[in-house]
Amino acid sequence: MLLPKRTKYRRPHRIKYEGKAKGNTKVDFGEFGLKSLDGAWITNRQIEAARIAMTRYMKRWGKVWIRIFPHMAKTKKPLEVRMGSGKGSPEEWVAVVKTGTVMFEVAGVSEETAREALRLAMHKLPVRCKIVKKGEE
């Protein structure tokens, strides 16, 4: 699972995922990428599930780059607790993904293998995505 080693603050303010991404919008490392068409918070479990789906389909050939990282702690209060008395404790770690962010990249495999691996990863994520080729963003 991906999570930060240390953070400056335990319980950060929420970061909005509306709007378009400013950076991380092009395929930089691999040949094919998975680009988000919506904004969302993606948990470290969803990132790991997508990574496993891709690497298992590619049978460990090629290389996978994960371009997002879950920096933000999402807090939750226990069940049946009254309102107030502070913010809840950190429950899970999420990555803030905006529209147009390239989340995963793949290289070293054929085009059909890369497209199928990225398609399998798409089904593990809570955002609509599209597969992009390097230079065709």
UniProtKB/Swiss-Prot annotation:
Instruction: Note the coiled coil stretches, chain numbering.
Output: none
BP terms from Gene Ontology: translation
Query: What UniProt keywords are attached to this protein's entry?
Result: Ribonucleoprotein, Ribosomal protein, RNA-binding, rRNA-binding, tRNA-binding
Cited InterPro entries: Ribosomal_uL16 (IPR047873), Ribosomal_uL16_bact-type (IPR000114), Ribosomal_uL16_CS (IPR020798), Ribosomal_uL16_dom (IPR016180), Ribosomal_uL16_sf (IPR036920)
State the Gene Ontology terms under molecular function.
rRNA binding; structural constituent of ribosome; tRNA binding
Q: What Gene Ontology cellular-component terms does the record carry?
A: cytosolic large ribosomal subunit
Quote the subunit structure annotation.
Answer: Part of the 50S ribosomal subunit.
Role description: Binds 23S rRNA and is also seen to make contacts with the A and possibly P site tRNAs.
**Which family, according to UniProt?**
Belongs to the universal ribosomal protein uL16 family.
Which protein is depicted?
Large ribosomal subunit protein uL16
Give the organism the record lists.
Spiroplasma citri
